[in-house]
Structures are given as structure tokens and as C-alpha cells.
Amino acid sequence: MANPITQAFFDAWTLISNADSDLISVLGLSLRVSLTATVIAGVLGAFLGVLLATIPFYGRAALISILNTLLGLPSVVVGLLVYILLSRAGPLGPLGLLFTPTAMVIAQSILITPLVAALSRQAISQTWQEIAPLLKSLGLPRWRIAMTLIEQTRFALLIIMLTAFGRAISEVGAVIIVGGNIAGVTRVMTTSIALETSKGEISFALALGFVLLATVLVINICAGLAKRDQAIVG
């Protein structure tokens, strides 16, 4: 008789190699939610990064401090706040977004936007110090300066986006609160791993774990390639 742990690993590999439909469904939803949240956070975060790096204004230092503080914001707190906003008694309750993928996107976006903004500000600030005199001498409008800075820091921003995506797809606290972990609707890899483990379905949990690890590995490889290209160009 095979060892239960060995059998669980074997069954997990079988699920992956056979492209189990439930596994693919969970993976697909995870990617859609996290990619959407990353795009939203990328746009908002890059805008804030440019703003904080190039334009001095009253309260700028305080805003930077708040952003840095939000980097350590617990995901369950984000989930709780979004839950309150989207609940029936909340201000956005009539929209009926609670326990939907949209609610999960909102939670993940709030969670990773400070990360993108803080890291973007650091990257853009360094480039701004180097080329600010040139850009100012050309008399470019602010939007053109912003686009130039984004273009000049594109590799750094790509790495930041990959980091944010990795943070989003591995998140569990917020999405399980606002999504409800509903099968076929809001069940993603992390919440499914937690559920299947509690049910004793170790094989399926392991299969999801392997897929999640593979996803993170691909992200790290892409980030490494981006760093290499940045070093070559820069």
C-alpha cells in the first residue's frame, strides 16, 4: 500500500497532467482577477509615482509616509473595509458587488496600489533627478514629461508590475472575505487551497499549490529577464 503522502503527490501530478477541469477553472479565475487588479493598480500607481516624484506640493511628504505605511497593510483589513463598503448596509451595497469577482478585483487593487505607487515613485524619482534639467529646458508639457519618465523607467515599472501581480495572486485574506470562496464563481487558487486542505483533499490542494508555485516562478523569471534587459539598455 502506497504511503498516503506519496499517493497525494502522485494524485496531484495526475490532476495537473490531465488538466483537471476544476483546476483549470480555478486557475483561470485567479489569473483574470489578479491581472485585472494589477492593470488597475499599475495605472493608478504609476500616476501617483510620477506625481510624487516630480511635483512638489504641500503634504507630499505626508502622502509618501502614508504610502509607505500602507505597504504593510494586512490583507484581512483591506477585505474587511471592502466588505463594509459593498455590504447591503454599506454605501455601495445597491451595486450588488459583494461575493463577486469584481469585489475581489477591488480588494486586490486597493492592496497592491500602494506597492506600485511607492516603488514607482522611487524608480521615477531617480530618473527624474538625472534628466530633469534636460526635460525642463525643452519646455515640454507635464503630460509629455510624465510619458517620457514612464518610457525611461519602463523596465523598472515592468518589474514592479510583476511584483504586484505576484502579491495579488498569492493573496488569500481579502479575497476570501469579499469573494466568499464560492465554487465556480469566486474560488481562486489560494482560497481553494485553504478549503481543500481543511476538507482533507490534500491531492487537489497540492495540485493547486504546484500551479501557484509555477506561476510565481514564471513571474520571477520574467522579472529577472527584465532586470537583465534593463542592465543592457541602461
Task: Report residues per predicted region.
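Periplasmic/extracellular loop-to-transmembrane helix junction in inner-membrane transport proteins
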Residues: 1-38, 55-57, 149, 198-201
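Alpha-helical transmembrane segments of multi-pass membrane proteins
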Residues: 29-37, 70, 143, 147-159, ...
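Transmembrane-helix boundary motif in ABC transporter permease subunits
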Residues: 36-67, 142, 149, 222-227
